[in-house]
Amino acid sequence: MSEYSLFTSESVSEGHPDKIADQISDAVLDAIITQDKYARVACETLVKTGVAIIAGEVTTSAWVDLEELVRKVIIDIGYNSSDVGFDGATCAVMNIIGKQSVDIAQGVDRSKPEDQGAGDQGLMFGYASNETDVLMPAPICFSHRLVERQAEARKSGLLPWLRPDAKSQVTCRYENGKVVGIDAVVLSTQHNPEVSQKDLQEAVMELIVKHTLPAELLHKDTQYHINPTGNFIIGGPVGDCGLTGRKIIVDSYGGMARHGGGAFSGKDPSKVDRSAAYAGRYVAKNIVAAGLAERCEIQVSYAIGVAQPTSISINTFGTGKVSDDKIIQLVRECFDLRPYAITKMLDLLHPMYQETAAYGHFGRTPQQKTVGDDTFTTFTWERTDRAQSLRDAAGL
């Protein structure tokens, strides 16, 4: 972090319109994968006043009641009444999903699964840093926790006048690559009309901001901006149109690392936009957990229909205990980054994706989950189970 003395990241709640779209797209993916693990899914969603539109390309033997599924996601988020401007029970649901192009399929599918080609060309990044216990940048971690707490306070009834839409932003101060303070906090939350701004700001400060952020990082000069424009009654898809894939920096590292541009939600693991980004995080996190570097960014790239990455690059920003070239060699020895191998390595053919679609895909805790007869582990790319083998291979 020597490049910046201040760094800011933002997050958005599950009720933000773009996140509604992401969650619907991943709910569709999960529902299909539950029945057909090898389905090809690319699902895009648009939400606006009174309507949810799902589109994209799917090749599967599964049958899913997509209208019912879309409505359930919207209602579970908290849009269950016209009073909040959007109601999953009464909104229109349009389904214009088609089939995957045969041209793409012939480039991806192989008789030997391990030779499966990448679903598209592209470049993906993974990142890890030792500045937090989850090996993620602090500004995005704190931003996620604020909007998670907003949803918790809303759903539990602690602050019943909160509505689903919210955004957060945190500015951290760094010295010698370590976080030494939080200089600014922004939290905008949708709310019912009857609550006063004074009551809202006091409650949000005490029960969300101070409850969530480390007290030792807050100081007398920290700036707090809670609903700085005043009223935030109109929100969600009424206030703004929501689209899948428009929060890719929120989904990843909050701007601290580079991004290849490909979104995650609605894409099955054959799409390297998603699976290779997850693999990149897995590699970078294990490198940092192994003590090979304090910070690590990895770039991988692919050509459509080709299994092997076209490049693997590493940058440890001068924090490496061994050279970046040596780490690249270790990565090639310890990780198979072909698309099929990534799917096997991270056990990605399970309905684990809707949970990733709010509050970040990285820095989360792997947990065992059961859907029907399928028991699996979520967020497998957050494991550090290869750190010791990397240390041994590096001679540390």
Curated annotation (Swiss-Prot):
The keyword Membrane does not apply. Its cofactor is Mg(2+); K(+). Mg(2+) binds at D18. Pathway: Amino-acid biosynthesis; S-adenosyl-L-methionine biosynthesis; S-adenosyl-L-methionine from L-methionine: step 1/1. Pfam families: S-AdoMet_synt_C, S-AdoMet_synt_M, S-AdoMet_synt_N. Its EC number is 2.5.1.6. SUPFAM superfamilies: S-adenosylmethionine synthetase. It catalyses: L-methionine + ATP + H2O = S-adenosyl-L-methionine + phosphate + diphosphate. It comes from the Bacteria. Homotetramer; dimer of dimers. Belongs to the AdoMet synthase family. HAMAP family: S_AdoMet_synth1 (MF_00086). This is S-adenosylmethionine synthase. It comes from Pseudomonas putida (strain W619). The lineage of its organism: Bacteria, Pseudomonadati, Pseudomonadota, Gammaproteobacteria, Pseudomonadales. The gene is metK.
